Amino acid sequence: MTIAIDFVGTNLGSGTKTYNINFCNELSSLELKRNIKIFLCENYLTEINEKIIKNNKIEYIIKPNFLSITFFRMIWMQFIFPFQLKLMGVKKLYSPMNFSPLIAKLLNIKVILCLHSNLPWIHFDLMPGNLVRNFITKKLMELSIKTCNLLIVVSHSAKKEIAEILKLDIKKIEVIYLNINNKYFFLDKNKKLIKKYNYESRYILSVMSCVRYHNIIN
């Protein structure tokens, strides 16, 4: 069975890009039994480990950089991508960025969708962007969720939450926690910082961009 992964995404510094690049690089450590077709924009190639590019089980389908722009990416994803998958004989698609081709199911392509956040249903007012764009984003996410074969979420609380909100079959949802780069994770105690900010000896440092929808409480 040929599997495809859709990493055609933003080139801006973000959690989405980090997720996509790290996912690609981690594949290099696996002994793959099936052929995988990875779709991504040309500007991602400079950040992918050369070892994985040489993996004979992986074929890179390079797309033009303008597809990193959301509007063009959505048009491509919904009206071109699914037919391209069908012509390539792809039977299963992993869509890791909240959206998937809505007609994939009609083309007999199974879709695994990863949902990174329940924000549109829990705090719609905190979504970045204007009201019209956010409304369309939310509806496309809902349709993607309802048409996928398997939904992956990042926590058990997120699983329960989205299942209740969208009336989903709980058996259709799996939990896989997000990870972190090893270069950002280490155990260390800086006595000056602990004393200055009155931290306890054990604490969690959360590395994220300072935006309102990350719900950072000071």
Stretches with model-predicted labels:
Residues M1-N218:
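Carbohydrate transferase catalytic cores enriched for Leloir-type hexosyltransferases
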